Amino acid sequence: VHFSFQNIIFLLVAVAGFGLFAWQAQKIRANILVGRDRDMSGNVNERLWKTLLVAFGQQKMFKRLTPAFLHLIVYVGFIVINIEVIEILIDGIFGTHRVLGFMGPLYSALTGTNEVLGALVVLAVAAFWWRRNGSVVRRFTGPEMRAWPRMDANVILYIEVILMVALFTMNAADLKLHQLEGKALPGAFPISSLLTGLFPDSVTALHVLERVGWWAHIVGILLFLNYLPSSKHFHIIMAFPNVYFSRLMPQGKFSNVDSITHEVKAMMDPTYQVPTPPVSEGAEAAPTSFGAKDVNDLAWTNLLNAYSCTECGRCTSVCPANLTGKLLSPRKIIMDTRDRMEEKYNSPLIFNPNLYGKEAKHDPQEQLDKENHTLLRGYVTPEELWACTTCNACVEACPVNINPLESIIEMRRFLVLEESAAPNSLNVMFSNIENNGAPWAFSPSDRFNWADELYVTDKAGATA
């Protein structure tokens, strides 16, 4: 252990980096908790198993093999390379050098794997960049993917390349330095050993390059960590709790408003006793209004969805409404929810929805009238909501179990129950149900007229 001024500087930088991230994470947590309460406790084993398969195991990614393979490389590389980050943190605080070298063959296996994965990450990032900027992948386009979202996707790729370059610079310079000094460097460096020829033979220059690579790598990681809350890549953290708290009941089953359900049952059966505690999974506290007009009307799990979105567009690419030219984009619903939260409550350090991306969604006059903004109409139009066929294709496609349909249904409920603003076709159906007991405009007495020319002659008996 050797303490120096450099260790003090490192400790201050590390504390500032992690502290700033914790501050941003707390702001995001506060945003999520403005949502309505929803009981998602219980079924721990089932939830853990789903998290293991979907979040850790990337199960739903492999429906599209090419991006799944590329993403797997970056994902595994991210996990393994972070083992070296632990070593850098220990070295930076205590003044040691490659403190985990005592692990011998295991350390060599780790550093060798680290290097190979680092090279593969660079190749995968290049492929991702081409898919976003060189090829035409339809799901990477759309009005919601202009300005900040498009820039953010590329910034992340550039940061990942810079981090890998810093890593190889540190390792290659350190390896050549030890070779010149006739010393053995713990570990295996299959990629860096190929790069040593690019480095000078000066011991002083190699010392400088090794330190530059070391500092660039760890400071870059801390900067990346604090960029995450402003980026779609925050999903690398939020995907795990989002999958854990995702709904377990069948996708086709909607959660009714309990208070309305109990009222209807009590009207039909005077002996019906309204239960006090909610019993169904996902049951919410009694609402002050029906449905959702703004983000605070949605459940906290819906707001957690918004921070878990990868903006990959898989949901929109399978949406039948979007595919037939309707305005609805499930991805936009989720992105709008996040933007509205950060407009109304807490914004992260870098991204502020008041500054980026709004030209694709609002005219200048709307931007000046932010106090009157709500999620419904301010960001999401009724036309988008009523285009939804409630088919659950978006939910099935999402690799991190986001459920845009829940938010859509809640905003529809507000339109119908609070504003009586359902489309005319639905209003006709509601009137028919009220007057005729069926969605169709036929008298109940005429309900069996279709059977007149069939073998059924005793319609009274058929209805008995």
Predicted features along the sequence, with ranges:
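Membrane-embedded alpha-helical bundles of multi-pass integral membrane proteins
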Residues: 1-277, 335
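Generic recognition of flexible, low-complexity loop/linker segments
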Residues: 152-153, 202, 208-213, 224-226, ...
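Ferredoxin-type iron-sulfur electron-transfer modules and their immediate structural context
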Residues: 226, 230-385, 430-439
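Short linear motifs at secondary-structure transitions and domain/linker junctions
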Residues: 202-204, 283-285, 441-445
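P-loop NTPase catalytic cores that bind/hydrolyze ATP
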Residues: 217-221, 231-236, 312-313, 388, ...
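Iron-sulfur-cluster electron-transfer modules
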Residues: 2-130, 134, 297-300, 306, ...
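Short, highly charged low-complexity linear segments
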Residues: 136-143, 185, 282, 450-458
